[in-house]
A protein has these predicted regions:
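Acidic, gly/ser/pro-rich intrinsically disordered tails
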Residues: 1-42, 46-52, 85-99, 108-117, ...
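Flexible glycine-rich surface loops and low-complexity tracts that mediate binding to linear polymers
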Residues: 58-74, 154-167
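Surface-exposed, glycine-biased beta-strand/turn segments
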Residues: 68, 74, 92-103
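Short, compact, well-ordered microdomains
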Residues: 75-81, 173
Length: 214
């Protein structure tokens, strides 16, 4: 998963196809000595960012943040999670984005809701001091199915938003996933007891063997 932060100048008006807003921009700064990078911004029209894209006019400048992929034509295609302009600069101060890496914890079943499904599953990471941090991820829809089916210990990068909730006078952190990337296992030898499927646990030794060099 590639999340880019780019300063852009809009070069054309927004187009809409099949419910998706499409805007062409170029990287800043642009000059005669430098070939600007062409960036295609795409987002659903009913999404908050999609509505903002529709209002952008040619020659407007903005800051765009979101998952990005290159094309064979030398264009970057971004699905922006945040667009910041001079008019909505306060949105940058209110940015809510987490990126967590680690190994998936014990399997968890999908829960059926009225119009979708949700899976709540832990993600664990161990630092150099052998301290393990656990993040309880919540994924909906197609991401829910993926999160429910993968084996414990699967190397994972999760991107989304963090929020808080309270129950019985206790505060909980919630990590709602927008994007998930599952990585291939490291070529390093993983301990035989890295994942105890019978007990549904992931050992910290397994987490330490995961290579997240991208």
């Amino acid at each position: 998963m590639n999340v880019f932060t780019l300063g852009l100048r809009i070069t054309g008006t927004a187009n809409e196809t099949d419910g998706v807003v499409d805007v062409i921009a170029e990287s800043l700064p642009a000059s005669d000595r430098r070939v600007p990078t062409k960036v295609q911004l795409k987002q659903k029209k009913d999404h908050y960012v999609g509505k903002l894209l529709q209002s952008l006019e040619a020659d407007a400048t903005c800051l765009a943040i979101g998952p990005t992929k290159p094309t064979l034509d030398g264009v970057l295609v971004m699905q922006p999670m945040l667009i910041v302009t001079k008019e909505n600069f306060d949105d940058l101060l209110a940015i809510n984005l987490f990126m967590a890496t680690g190994g998936l914890g014990p399997k968890s079943d999908e829960i059926e809701l009225d119009d979708t499904t949700v899976t709540n599953r832990s993600l664990a990471w161990q630092n150099d001091d052998k301290e393990t941090s656990w993040f309880k991820l919540s994924a909906f829809g197609e991401l829910s199915k993926q999160l429910a089916e993968l084996a414990p210990g699967t190397p994972t990068i999760a991107v989304g938003k963090v929020s808080s909730s309270t129950k019985d006078e206790k505060t909980y952190l919630n990590y709602t996933v927008d994007r998930v990337l599952y990585l291939p296992k490291s070529t390093r030898s993983t301990p035989k007891k890295a994942a105890d499927t019978e007990k549904g646990q992931v050992t910290t030794a397994a987490l330490g063997s995961i290579d997240f060099s991208l």
